[in-house]
Amino acid sequence: MGFFRQLFSLSLCALSLAIPSKLIGLENTQDVIPNSYIVVMKSTISEAEFQTHQAWASKIHRRNLGERDGTLGGLDGLKTTFEFEGLKGYSGAFDKRTIELISRNPAVDYVEVDRVVKLDAITTQRNAPSWGLGRISHKSAGSSDFVFDDSAGSGITIYGVDTGIDIKHPEFSGRATWGTNTVDNEDTDQNGHGTHTAGTFAGATYGIAKKANVIAVKVLNAQGTGSTSGVIQGIQWCTDHAGRNGLRGKAAMNLSLGIRGSTVFNRVAEAAQQSGIFLAVAAGNDGTDAAQFSPASARGVCTAAATNSQDAATSWSNYGSVVAVYGPGADIVSAYPNEDTATLSGTSMASPHVCGVGAYLMALEGIGPDKVCDRIKELAVESVTNQKPNTTRKLLYNGSGA
């Protein structure tokens, strides 16, 4: 019997070698995590077939390592799986021989190299004045008053997928809770970026959706870096949590992070949006076309570029046809860990403005996540100067009438 099992295993390997490799993302060598991969299955695969494939991949991994030197050598094999509507896959650490066989397996759609994900913030300045709230609640620049409806995001839950959030910060008035951590064992914001973005989309003083609930989803470490696979885990947790708790259709997510174009990252972002969560994402800070970055180029998400207080597109903001709207992104003051405040700049700061307005409109107008970005674009004002190629001039506006 063992002979036939061995023969079957060898037959699978031979079949795999007859199929072209489906490794992608190799052209983006920047920030690649060595020997780490994300495997995406074909959309037609059943749950039973997915389980069988995982067992096969793990067996091939163990066999190849055993033939090499008998040690793992940091190559742990299959680590985590993810499942969205029409999208299944897993991530892991494999040697080149194993991942080549996996990529040729008939059940596999493609394999993408795992890469380092970074924040989209660029500068820090302590305790500077903010201007973003006044700007997004008036059709013209110049006012420091924030005009908004008292519903203020009530009944909406916002997932901050970031460096974590200081959930005890007074800005959140008991509305913030810890969700999950896919990057380390420190369930706190050791960087500050996640607390800052959350303060913008839902803080009591510096925020837009002041009555929304906030959930911290930590996918980036103290240095502001993580992995594509770790971010996918975090997004998976959000969609599962929203489903279990009846929050689909009443939830938003902020993604102030990104990498060079990733097919799997875009597909996961699209799946999360389609599951009933409004996604606001940062365009990036490379001063180039945002279509080259993920999740900025994902379909259906609301991609935010950045302006300064004079309504000019910043020199560092990415741009292009994937940008849905501009938002305040230069010198934005917001919450910071340990009851502090700080001022940051970047499309990381524009995105939570869009996320906050999205949550605000969901509560105020009762619109679904799939309609929010269109509504944001409908309300936005044509006021952005220093226009970039093939890019909207629309600036975020909450429709207050001011």
Curated annotation (Swiss-Prot):
Listed CDD domains: Peptidases_S8_PCSK9_ProteinaseK_like
Broad EC category: hydrolase
Database matches in PROSITE patterns: SUBTILASE, SUBTILASE_SER
GO molecular function: serine-type endopeptidase activity
Residue ranges annotated as propeptide in the record: 21-120
Residues annotated as domain Inhibitor I9: 36-119
Subcellular location(s) per record: Secreted
Domain Peptidase S8: 130-402
The entry's keywords: Glycoprotein, Hydrolase, Protease, Secreted, Serine protease, Signal, Virulence, Zymogen
Principal subcellular localization: secreted
EC number: 3.4.21.-
UniProt key word Translocase: no
A single GO cellular-component term on record: extracellular region
Superkingdom field: Eukaryota
List of catalytic residues: D162, H193, S348
Pfam families, per database record: Inhibitor_I9, Peptidase_S8
Swiss-Prot/TrEMBL GO biological process terms: proteolysis
Similarity-based family: Belongs to the peptidase S8 family.
Protein role: Secreted subtilisin-like serine protease with keratinolytic activity that contributes to pathogenicity.
Protein name: Subtilisin-like protease 9
Organism of origin: Arthroderma benhamiae (strain ATCC MYA-4681 / CBS 112371) (Trichophyton mentagrophytes)
